[in-house]
């Protein structure tokens, strides 16, 4: 880390407080500064200052800054934010002097390094190969089950249906207490053999919710039933409409209360959570998707590329619908914990998303530095040549900076590709 190398140049003996100040009028005046930016408020998913940037920052006497002091850092204000509605804004990072840079950089790097890991596990997941349980029940052995089957066949998911279903189910369980017939066995049998429509699934899901406090007493049992529901949804290609999604979320919410936990789904296995993540993405529930994906990332369990790309597509849809003016800011917020994924991925499409959402060449350089460390860097960067050139031009604010940044980009291309820069990329490069 460059901190230890440059500390002696820009750190006084008694540094007790770190400050990054945002100028409002005169950058040289104390009145021109407002509340310091805490590094933990910065939610940039992939920007890290390089050693050269850190050295330059600590060597600049007058108004040292990151990313040229431009307001391109995505900030989340924790005191004004909720998990569903974060308060986001762009800010610039400019210091009044070199005095407090080192402690600030230490904190900034610590926050980001503590979540970094070279170890990661890609979930080997196929939705139609979920670990379901084979039911051993039959109507021949349990003829009273036919009543439940008949109710299912005629249901529309209404209150009367669920009431009658519950009466019959409880009656069967009471009569069969001596045979150790468990309620989860009945649910699994019905889901596997008779739940063929969304109204039927809604009815059974509501019934499972009602029995969380009477029969389903372990999270592992609930996970078995959730697996059956998820397998059914994926195999039948059910559309997750609002009623079905609310019913399913109601089940999980009741499970949180039952098992006295913030989120019972976090206790599921990685394969179950990934299947559930697919469900949330298909239902375009971006907040639940972000929450569950964040849990997987924190466990160093990364979904397959196709699921990550589906999540990124969902972000683009949601951001466009909600606030096109601050699209990049919101996209970075929804991917604020993606550093390890970006650092480890070899998929150009994932990296393209972050290139397109860069607002400064330093951000582009961060992506390029990650690619540079990969063995197959040539295969990764080739499909991105045009995107990198065009984005470099768009984030450069003058002819001089455009020329300088394109020269730097050319150096990256030469290192990674040698003379094998794609013809189309050469043509675009020459035109710029």
From Swiss-Prot:
It is found in: Mitochondrion. Residues 1-34 form a transit peptide. Coiled coil: none annotated. GO terms for molecular function: translation regulator activity. Keywords: Mitochondrion, Transit peptide, Translation regulation. GO terms for cellular component: mitochondrion. InterPro entries: Aep1. The keyword Mitochondrion applies. The keyword Mitochondrion applies. It comes from the Eukaryota. It holds the Pfam family AEP1. Belongs to the AEP1 family. Required for translation of the mitochondrial OLI1 transcript encoding subunit 9 of mitochondrial ATP synthase. This is ATPase expression protein 1, mitochondrial.
């Amino acid at each position: 880390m460059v901190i230890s190398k440059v500390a002696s140049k820009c750190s006084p003996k008694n540094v007790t407080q770190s400050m990054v100040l945002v100028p409002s009028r005169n950058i040289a005046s104390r009145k021109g500064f407002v509340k310091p930016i805490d590094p933990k408020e910065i939610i940039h998913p992939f920007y890290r200052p390089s050693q050269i940037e850190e050295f330059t920052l600590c060597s600049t006497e007058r108004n040292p800054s990151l990313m040229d002091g431009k307001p391109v850092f995505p900030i989340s204000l924790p005191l004004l934010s909720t998990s569903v509605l974060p308060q986001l804004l762009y800010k610039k990072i400019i210091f009044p002097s070199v005095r407090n840079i080192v402690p600030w950089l230490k904190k900034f790097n610590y926050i980001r390094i503590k979540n970094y890991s070279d170890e990661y596990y890609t979930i080997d997941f196929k939705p139609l190969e979920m670990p379901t349980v084979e039911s051993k029940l039959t109507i021949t052995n349990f003829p009273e089950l036919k009543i439940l089957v008949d109710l299912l066949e005629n249901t529309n998911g209404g209150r009367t249906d669920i009431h009658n279903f519950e009466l019959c189910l409880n009656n069967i369980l009471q009569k069969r207490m001596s045979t150790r017939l468990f309620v989860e066995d009945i649910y699994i049998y019905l889901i596997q053999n008779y739940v063929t429509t969304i109204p039927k699934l809604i009815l059974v899901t509501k019934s499972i919710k009602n029995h969380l406090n009477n029969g389903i007493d372990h999270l592992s049992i609930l996970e078995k039933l959730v697996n059956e529901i998820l397998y059914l949804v994926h195999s039948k290609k059910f559309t997750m409409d609002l009623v079905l999604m609310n019913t399913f979320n109601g089940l999980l919410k009741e499970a949180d209360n039952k098992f006295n936990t913030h989120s019972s789904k976090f206790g599921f296995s990685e394969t179950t959570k990934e299947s559930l993540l697919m469900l949330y993405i298909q239902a375009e529930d971006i907040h639940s998707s972000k929450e569950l994906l964040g849990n997987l990332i924190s466990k160093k369990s990364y979904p397959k590329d196709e699921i990550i790309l589906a999540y990124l597509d969902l972000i683009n849809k949601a951001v466009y619908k909600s606030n096109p003016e601050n699209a990049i800011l919101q996209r970075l917020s929804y991917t604020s914990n993606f550093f390890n994924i970006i650092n480890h991925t070899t998929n150009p499409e994932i990296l393209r998303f972050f290139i397109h959402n860069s607002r400064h060449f330093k951000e582009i350089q961060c992506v390029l530095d990650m690619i540079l460390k990969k063995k197959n860097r040539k295969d990764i960067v080739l499909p991105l040549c045009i995107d990198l050139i065009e984005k470099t031009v768009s984030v450069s604010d003058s002819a001089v900076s455009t020329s300088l940044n394109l020269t730097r980009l050319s150096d990256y291309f030469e290192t990674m590709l040698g003379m094998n820069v794609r013809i189309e990329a050469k043509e675009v490069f020459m035109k710029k």
